[in-house]
């Protein structure tokens, strides 16, 4: 395990916000983490788990001990006629892992290509894109309890997946302990490894209009997994800025869901609103459209701005602070609520 002090975090968060960690521990194995918890001083200290840094907004220097997850490794752990189960260390880059599965001839994650972040963060956020979410391919994960050092395995039900949500995003109720089977593991668990079940035979997920357009443009009627992967990468690259060039955290707000009755009421006032019926009977509204309709595209608060090509993305125009990002986000939330009566929920965690 590598221990560092007064570590600049600009390179460790995709917004590129300037901040420091008082102490940063590079956790490269389960044994490294066990050693941290065996140290009485560090075991008792507050901790902040840092993966790929693609879903956080830093508003200042990080005082808790930063656990930088760098647990690597990829392998096939099971294979039969129905599915192949693959496992990756929590520190693996998500897109690189998706690419690796295709290189191994194991399709199923191609719709999730080019999503920033780490493998360990993918179930925390239940990342999803173009008709597929992590929960659709999830098998199980191993995590360590940061209070007790116990390692346990969670299945999909225990992870309590929801739309960009999981058990790892919620703290246990005050006075109660989070558990492997109960709700509330935020700040309590560190994910070590994640396993995904890739079903056989492979069937492409092409329900999204952008993918259907690519099929029409190319004349392909039966795409291969690699073609779907390439289309997804091209679509995302055209819509979203590269965080290596323009700091951002991808989609900043969740797409809100409303009842059909609420949707009809909004349509009566806003006939052009972009909306999608969901299998559970609710209606999902396009948060980017709501923000754009309120006139925010291209606007800024300090050096934090709304991306000109996609209003759902907030960007660092150069030297933005976390406070400016938060102020901009709150102003957008207020505008959308005042016009549509809808409360937008941010995706990134504010630290």
Language model feature labels by segment:
Residues 1-148, 158:
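Anion-binding (especially nucleotide phosphate/pyrophosphate-binding) glycine-rich loop
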Residues 4-5, 10-17, 56, 151-323, ...:
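Phosphate/pyrophosphate- and phosphate-bearing ligand-binding catalytic cores of soluble enzymes
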Residues 106, 322-325:
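Beta-rich strand-turn-strand
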Residues 336:
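Conserved ATP-binding N-box helix of the HATPase_c
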């Amino acid at each position: 395990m590598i221990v560092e002090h007064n570590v600049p975090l600009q390179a460790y968060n995709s917004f590129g916000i300037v901040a420091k960690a008082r102490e940063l521990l590079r956790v490269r194995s389960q044994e490294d983490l066990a050693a941290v918890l065996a140290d009485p001083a560090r075991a008792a200290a507050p901790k902040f788990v840092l993966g790929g840094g693609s879903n956080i907004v830093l508003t200042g220097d990080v005082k808790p001990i930063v656990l930088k997850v760098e647990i690597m490794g990829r392998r096939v752990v099971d294979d039969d006629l129905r599915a192949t189960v693959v496992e990756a260390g929590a520190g693996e880059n998500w897109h690189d892992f998706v690419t690796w599965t295709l290189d191994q001839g194991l399709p199923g994650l191609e719709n999730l290509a080019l999503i920033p972040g780490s493998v360990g963060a993918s179930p925390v956020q239940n990342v999803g894109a173009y008709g597929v979410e992590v929960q659709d391919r999830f098998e199980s994960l191993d995590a360590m309890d940061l209070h007790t050092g116990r390692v346990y395995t969670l299945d999909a039900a225990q992870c309590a997946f929801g739309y960009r949500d999981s058990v790892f995003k919620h703290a246990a109720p005050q006075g109660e302990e989070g558990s492997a089977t109960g709700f509330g593991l935020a700040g309590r668990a560190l994910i070590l490894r994640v396993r995904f079940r890739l079903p056989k035979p492979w069937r492409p997920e092409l329900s999204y209009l952008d993918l259907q357009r690519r099929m029409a443009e190319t004349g392909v009627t039966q795409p291969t997994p690699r073609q779907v992967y390439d289309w997804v990468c091209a679509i995302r690259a055209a819509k979203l800025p590269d965080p290596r060039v323009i700091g951002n955290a991808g989609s900043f707000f969740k797409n809100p869901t409303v009842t059909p009755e609420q949707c009809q009421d909004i349509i009566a006032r806003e006939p052009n609103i972009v909306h999608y019926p969901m299998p559970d009977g609710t209606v999902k509204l396009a948060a980017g459209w709501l923000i754009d309709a309120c006139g925010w595209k291209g606007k800024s608060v300090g050096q934090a701005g709304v991306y000109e090509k996609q209003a759902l993305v907030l960007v660092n125009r150069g030297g933005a602070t976390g406070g400016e990002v938060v102020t901009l986000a709150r102003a957008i939330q207020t505008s959308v609520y005042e016009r549509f009566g809808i409360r937008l929920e941010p995706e990134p965690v504010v630290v």
